Amino acid sequence: MHDSPPVAQDIVERLKARNISVFNYHIPLDRVSPWSPGTNLAKALGVTPYEEFYEQNLVRMGLLCHTPFTTVTQFAQRVREVLGHEIRVYPYGDEQLIDGRIALMGGGASNPNIYAELREKGINLFLTGITWPEIPWVARNHAAAKEHGVTLVGGTHYSTEKFSPMEMVKFFEGLGLACEFIPETPRLQEL
């Protein structure tokens, strides 16, 4: 588990002076639920989850999904359209999707053991956020994906998770709270 540095007191004071509340909820939000990054990424892409996978910190975060697509190229085009920017495809598996199925997890999946599991479940494409192979833990994922014939599709950490906080806006508004989703610029170097 990683400890986050405390928020600097001057930032806290500036937020208080402007009556700004901050809500931060990470791993519990990552758990597959109506509010999770995976669920909302699947919804945005128009794919249908049928099973959860990838456990981290005692919660399941990834989804196996049925899609209307038959090829990596078709699915990648849909991802580009939905995310609104270029993506990166590492074609370690076949161009044909197995029965139109894919796996996805917003952000970044750090466990290289999932690629064997995905192939056992008949999946040959995994969409996630961070796929830049120069990061050591990502390099291990590339090796495992290549070994097991699973194509990696990278969409950036932010872009694969942004649909979750966008959905949370609706949740808070339903409670009568004014809130706003503030977009950021995707870090394309994560691809």
Question: Predicted segment positions?
Answer:
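Active-site catalytic microenvironments in core metabolic enzymes, especially phosphate/sugar-handling
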Residues: 1-191
